């Protein structure tokens, strides 16, 4: 237990929550070379405007990056899709890149994904990475319908893990307890954590999970667990690509695009 005054505990507790909901931004937002000549669109969402880019006409693959990342993750797959004549839509999630809002969470990101899909459609598939996978799943559980999804290096987030990470960083127990109380009172719509494994059981889209066995951020068992829960899902396990490079590896992207195009099952 800390011996900090109650006002200090309150301030520290709110700092813990802010750190959970506020991604660290780059000093200057950036755009992938592939999207420099793309059609850009600022899309209004219930939580503020987000930036998006469409490259190509017709049914498109929506590309959803992860936590503290941005549209630049998708330069390699956008180039490949462009060469094949497949349209893509990229976005910067709330709190990221060119999007103006500061806070984000899976539910905020899910609403943004749904809004971009509606504004930049038609969307016939989603490729997500890390946090973007879970936000996309939540958007789908709320009604966003797409025939195919490919999820790369998904996490399986739990609120208990977030509080444990705070404890591991040395945050005192009474500060964490106060942060939990504030979170439950002021963020009631987020207090019940979205359960990806339970949601996967009811999904209708064809799904492909992709994971590198040496992922330093999210264990490959996450994809294996989600694949088992998701009816008819497929999985690609690779190695030596870590958490982010797996979303840019040429051979892996070829297999993802084959799946999105309907050639991979």
PLM region descriptions:
Residues 1-44:
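An N-terminal hydrophobic leader/cap segment in hydrolases
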Residues 71, 78-100:
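Conserved alpha/beta-hydrolase
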Residues 103-124:
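Alpha/beta-hydrolase active-site loop
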Residues 127-136:
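Gly/Ala-rich beta-loop-alpha elbow adjacent to hydrolase catalytic centers
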Residues 144-189:
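Hydrolase active-site cap/lid region
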Residues 202-204, 209-211, 215:
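Short beta-strand/loop motif that positions the catalytic acidic residue
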Residues 241-253:
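Catalytic histidine-centered segment of alpha/beta-hydrolase-like enzymes
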């Amino acid at each position: 237990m800390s011996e900090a005054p109650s006002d200090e505990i309150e301030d520290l507790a709110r700092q813990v929550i802010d750190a959970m909901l506020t991604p660290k931004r780059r000093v200057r937002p950036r755009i992938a070379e592939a999207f420099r000549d793309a059609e850009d669109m600022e899309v209004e969402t219930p939580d503020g405007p987000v930036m998006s880019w469409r490259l190509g006409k017709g049914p498109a693959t929506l590309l959803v990056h992860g936590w503290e990342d941005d549209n630049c993750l998708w330069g390699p797959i956008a180039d490949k899709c462009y060469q094949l004549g497949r349209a893509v839509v990229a976005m910067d999630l709330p709190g990221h890149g060119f999007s103006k809002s500061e806070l984000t969470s899976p539910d905020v990101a899910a609403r943004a994904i749904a809004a971009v899909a509606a504004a930049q459609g038609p969307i016939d598939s989603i490729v997500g990475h890390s946090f973007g996978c879970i936000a996309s799943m939540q958007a789908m559980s709320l009604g966003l319908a797409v025939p195919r999804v490919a999820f790369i290096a998904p996490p399986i987030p739990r609120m208990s893990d977030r509080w444990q990470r705070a404890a591991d960083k040395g945050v005192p127990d009474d500060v964490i307890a106060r942060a939990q109380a504030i979170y439950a009172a002021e963020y009631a719509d987020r207090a019940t954590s979205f359960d990806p494994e339970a949601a996967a059981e009811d999904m209708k889209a064809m799904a492909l999970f992709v994971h590198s066995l040496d992922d330093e951020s999210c264990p490959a068992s996450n994809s294996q667990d989600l694949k088992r829960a998701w009816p008819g899902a497929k999985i690609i396990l690779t190695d030596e690509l870590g958490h982010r490079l797996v979303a840019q590896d040429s051979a892996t992207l070829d297999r993802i695009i084959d799946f999105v195009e309907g050639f991979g099952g």
